[in-house]
From Swiss-Prot:
SUPFAM superfamilies tied to this protein: Translation proteins
Keyword RNA-binding on entry: yes
Organism lineage: Bacteria, Pseudomonadati, Pseudomonadota, Acidithiobacillia, Acidithiobacillales
GO molecular function: rRNA binding; structural constituent of ribosome
Disordered: annotated segments: 131-150
Entries under InterPro entries matching the protein: Ribosomal_uL3, Ribosomal_uL3_bac/org-type, Ribosomal_uL3_CS, Transl_B-barrel_sf
Native source organism of the sequence: Acidithiobacillus ferrooxidans (strain ATCC 23270 / DSM 14882 / CIP 104768 / NCIMB 8455)
Similarity remark: Belongs to the universal ribosomal protein uL3 family.
Pfam family of the protein (one): Ribosomal_L3
HAMAP family the record matches: Ribosomal_uL3_B
Positions bearing N5-methylglutamine: Q151
Name the UniProt record assigns to this protein: Large ribosomal subunit protein uL3
Post-translational modification: Methylated by PrmB.
GO BP of this protein: translation
Length: 210
């Protein structure tokens, strides 16, 4: 895997491309990303770069995390994320990762926490078809139907699609087009929708299937 950036979702808008097409884009603001730790095979068993973004008041940082930042000589960050890399030779603690690691027209993968929907039924959560509206149906219009068999196996299998908590989980959208980069305002404009609500944190990486 290769390096990426941590950003914050601003919202969606539309822009006019050079060929006249009107494109729906998600705007992501990328605050300065600073290398907080470099991991290699000798010490950690794998190669990765830990990145910090944003700022946090010292009194809001736990002792363990404050020691981690102090050891590596950087100011406490609001958020820590890790990116796997093939080689860590080009990275050092304290260096900034800028928007120039991406280029306009490049394909990217965006990861974020999806919007939480709370407790949802099987129809909304798993896209089940609703039951018949009439003709003998009583109070089972949105019921999931049968969830098992009989005495054998005598249980409901794990993973059965049923009602439960919907959303608020890590989601990655693949192969999105990075339409425009505004370096002055530190904005990335990505075609289409990305996971999460406004002001949610997202991770942007070069596409693995691009």
């Amino acid at each position: 895997m290769v390096m990426g950036l941590i950003g914050r979702k601003v919202g969606m808008t539309r822009i006019v491309a050079g060929d006249g097409r009107v494109l729906p884009v998600t705007v992501i603001h990328v605050a300065p990303n600073t290398v907080a730790q470099v991991k290699d095979i000798a010490t950690d068993g794998y190669c990765a770069v830990q990145v910090a973004t944003g700022t946090r008041r010292p009194q809001r940082v736990t002792s363990a995390l404050a020691g981690h930042f102090r050891k590596n000589g950087i100011a406490p960050g609001r958020l820590l994320r890790e990116f796997r890399v093939a080689d860590t030779a080009n990275y050092a603690c304290g260096m900034d990762i800028d928007l120039d690691i991406f280029a306009e027209g490049q394909r990217v993968d965006v990861s974020g926490v999806s919007k939480g929907k709370g407790f949802a039924g099987a129809i909304k959560r798993h896209n089940f078809r609703s039951n018949r509206a009439s003709h003998g149906n009583s109070l089972s219009h949105r019921a999931p139907g049968s969830i098992g068999c009989r005495q054998t196996p005598g249980r409901v299998f794990k993973g059965k699609k049923m009602a439960g908590h919907l959303g608020a989980e890590q989601v990655t959208t693949l192969n999105l087009e990075l339409v425009r980069i505004d370096a002055n305002r530190r904005l990335l404009m990505i075609k289409g929708a990305v996971p999460g609500a406004r002001d949610g944190d997202v991770m942007i990486r070069p596409a693995v299937r691009g």
